[in-house]
């Protein structure tokens, strides 16, 4: 009896396979196609990811950001490939896309600040308003750029402090880059007493500037009387030098100005106030 049942089951299975062979063949084709799509998509994702990473590295973009962006590109391609594979075997991809969209929206709301920093980081490495090694002013902090990371940028101030600034704060504010241009202008203010010969002062200051080799002679040099102050005549000097030597030129010229003024007996006055006393008549 048991043997008869087994034979009947085999016959039923064989008949079912014969009746549904076309359907089964279609399933096999679709499943094979889905596997091929998935494998091909993963292979293409790897190639594109490596290509994007290589391009970003070639453009001197931070390795951390380049790796993150290339990995993000890879996962996006794999996700779309997976959806296409599921659709090939008959899964309703509309619901899958809706679920992924809802999940993405929820994650986006939860990580709103972080995503803002990430987007700002992408803009920083793409637009490149600042680069590693440049000295910048970001409004409330100034320093040399050490690293531009995915979510934040690190600066080192002149007194050696390490400051971490969120990227969205940088991209939404003003960026003053002191290192981008090869030349910058120095400005000096020199005060002398009122009894000093103005022409002599200009002559002395001009001689100091002309004897300084690091001052660019092909750029505008301004020396003039800028203010009649209460206690002094104030002169302004403007000259250009290379960005790398800007501070050194400033300190050296200040010393040379003082020495030359002393040699020519030109005094730098102290602030003074004239006090007039009147004797009150008792009558």
Swiss-Prot record:
Q: Which UniProt keywords apply?
A: Cell membrane, Membrane, Transmembrane, Transmembrane helix
Q: What InterPro entries does the annotation carry?
A: LSM_dom_sf, MS_channel_1st, MS_channel_C, MSC_TM_helix, MscS_archaea/bacteria_type, MscS_beta-dom_sf, MscS_channel_2nd, MscS_channel_C_sf
- Matching PROSITE patterns, A to Z? UPF0003
Kindly give the membrane topology term recorded for this protein: Multi-pass membrane protein
Residue spans crossing the bilayer = 24-44, 64-84, 96-116
Q: Where in the cell is it found?
A: Cell membrane
Looking at the Swiss-Prot or TrEMBL record, what is one Pfam family this protein matches? MS_channel_3rd
Cellular component terms (Gene Ontology): plasma membrane
GO molecular-function annotation terms?
mechanosensitive monoatomic ion channel activity
Record Gene3D superfamilies: 1.10.287.1260, 2.30.30.60, 3.30.70.100
Family to which the UniProt record says this protein belongs: Belongs to the MscS (TC 1.A.23) family.
Q: What is this protein called?
A: Uncharacterized MscS family protein BUsg_437
Q: Which organism is it from?
A: Buchnera aphidicola subsp. Schizaphis graminum (strain Sg)
Query: From which lineage does this chain's organism come?
Result: Bacteria, Pseudomonadati, Pseudomonadota, Gammaproteobacteria, Enterobacterales
């Amino acid at each position: 009896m048991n043997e008869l049942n087994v034979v009947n089951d085999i016959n039923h299975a064989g008949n079912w396979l014969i009746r549904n062979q076309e359907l089964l063949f279609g399933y096999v084709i679709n499943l094979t196609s889905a596997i091929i799509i998935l494998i091909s998509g993963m292979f293409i994702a790897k190639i594109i990811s490596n290509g994007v990473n290589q391009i970003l590295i070639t453009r001197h973009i931070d390795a951390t950001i380049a790796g993150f962006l290339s990995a993000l590109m890879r996962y996006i391609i794999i996700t779309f490939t997976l959806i296409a594979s599921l659709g090939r075997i008959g899964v309703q991809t509309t619901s899958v896309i809706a679920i992924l969209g809802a999940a993405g929206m929820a994650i986006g709301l939860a990580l709103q600040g972080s995503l803002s920093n990430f987007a700002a980081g992408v803009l920083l490495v793409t637009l490149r308003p600042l680069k590693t090694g440049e000295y910048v002013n970001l409004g409330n902090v100034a320093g040399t750029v050490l690293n531009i990371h995915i979510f934040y940028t690190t600066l080192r101030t002149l007194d050696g402090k390490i400051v971490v600034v969120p990227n969205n704060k940088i991209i939404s504010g003003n960026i003053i880059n002191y290192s981008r241009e090869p030349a910058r202008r120095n400005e000096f203010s020199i005060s002398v007493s009122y009894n000093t010969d103005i022409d002599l002062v200009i002559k002395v200051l001009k001689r100091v500037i002309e004897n300084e080799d690091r001052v660019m002679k092909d750029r505008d040099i301004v020396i003039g009387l800028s203010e009649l102050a209460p206690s002094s005549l104030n002169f302004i000097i403007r000259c250009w030098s290379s960005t790398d030597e800007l501070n050194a030129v400033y300190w050296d010229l200040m010393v040379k100005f003082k020495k030359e003024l002393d040699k020519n007996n030109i005094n730098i006055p102290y602030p003074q106030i004239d006090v007039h006393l009147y004797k009150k008549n008792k009558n």
